[in-house]
């Protein structure tokens, strides 16, 4: 697993090993490796520091929990935002992160929002963690247009307002925490109380 890339984005490596695999490929005679995130049709989203693409077919990813069917689904634009969410939950509540309390859908592109509408129909509560831009708002409005009358649709992007996306929010949170710990470490060794990341 290309941990150097995950460290830059402050993604939890163990969570990523569970959710992703490693892809190795050759391009122009050079060998590369990347993170590969599976989708619902057997394809993969592929990412490394220099490359962002997919192994066809392009499709959404639908992560369903085992056991009793969940009535809540969290929806993300890309898998880096999904991994950022898991990391934030794990960091703030390491003993009870509640990662399996809901299902997840990763669009793998806002252009795939239509493909997500049918599976979203089985959920009572939908939380959308889209980018804070026009495309993200359009995707949210499309889901609200389809299900807004009889389902709870939440715009969770308000949590990271001022950031482009959830991954940027994660990076800023961890950088801020490290700066505070560094400053406090000079004066005190007392542990910092966690505020938590509840969604």
Task: Label every PLM stretch briefly.
Residues 89-199:
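TOPRIM fold recognition
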Residues 70-72, 124-125:
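Short coil/turn segments at beta-strand junctions that form active-site/ligand-binding loops
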Residues 80-81, 139:
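Acidic, divalent-metal-coordinating active-site segment for phosphoryl/phosphodiester hydrolysis
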Residues 31-32, 68-70, 100:
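Short, well-ordered loop/turn elements at secondary-structure boundaries
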Residues 74-77:
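Short hydrophobic beta-strand that contains or immediately precedes a catalytic carboxylate
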Residues 1-60, 64-65:
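Basic, glycine-enriched DNA-binding surface that flanks or lies within the catalytic cores of DNA
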